[in-house]
Amino acid sequence: MKKIKFLMMAAVALVTAMSFTACSDDDDNSSNYQKYQQEVTNMVNKQKKNDKVILIVAFGSTWQQAYDTFEKVVDDYKANFPGWDVFLSFSSIECINNAREGENVAPKDYYDPEHWLNAIGQARYKKIVVQSLQVIPGEEYRNVRDSYVKNFMNNKNGIFTTEYLKSLDRNVVIGTPLMAEESDAEALAEVLNKESDIKAAVAEGIVAFMGHGNPEGYDYYGGNIRYVQLEQYLRAINENYYVGTVDMDQTLVDDVLENIAGRTVTYEVGAISMDVTYAANNAKKAQLYPLMSIAGDHAHNDMADPDDEGSWFSMFNDADIKTMAYETTFKEACLKGYTDGTGYIPALAERSAVRKLWMNHTREAIDKLGTEDALSTPTTAPDEE
């Protein structure tokens, strides 16, 4: 009986301890949320100079090269949008946490769109543009649009007055990703082909761009087709251009190498079907570029890692195509670029001409302010008007 009583007491103690631990974790999460919210609120209040604001939303990263790129983006926006305050957020909580821990370089604080939008609302901005720094409209863009922005407009946290929400009606807009439409893919192709380093590389051999892409089942807006369209516009200029991705079916590195060898492919993307014929390309030299806003883990590992047998760098070289992902001695340039931001080949947002394309989307979004194309708040939704 004493043994049973002891075991029962031990079980109660264990459950109690677990309950206290769970409560402690909840308290810590709540405390951290409030702490980060106060930090963002203080920044917004201190830096507010206007009643209009642009919040740029990137997925995030933990590399210095990417951090430097984000600074260039923000600086460009501040220079090109006078009268607007500009802030940057990460949509990836994992990137935010890893950046704070200093995963690859010195620790750095970034915050998610929820904290920024809370602070922006509390600062009573009158016009708000949320600009996506994604390349195509996919899973991350959906998260920004249908979670962060929607929750803000619906006053999820209950921190805004009805009067303020009414004032936001038709005064909040979302800037679309780099290749939201087919015409954007054509514009990007023209810009990339004019970049001096790309133009020189494609004149000497293959230029292969590596995008991210949406895996099967996650191509919410049919954005994957933009990679195929971009490639076709590039190849209309020079057949040494190729475009592939990390996650999109039919465009993985094996597929790109088969295209280089020569074949006909029927791309099936959503409701769109495209037959594309690739002539055999006998070039023995290739240059790889990240087709992403920044060069982070995917560019570092999936594209350029010489020690990874499955990286684009390794597989291209194994196919007897002398391939570089950086201009100088590969491994040294790669590591240097990622840790101190020098000695690398740029990703999309590092190119001034490409940043202008994103800013064009922001201007298009601004033009929608005050119109039926802007977002409405629940206080003025059609069924309540």
Spell out what each predicted region is:
Residues S24-E385:
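Active-site-proximal alpha-helix that buttresses catalytic centers in soluble enzyme cores
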Residues M18-A22:
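C-terminal motif of bacterial Sec signal peptides marking the signal peptidase cleavage site
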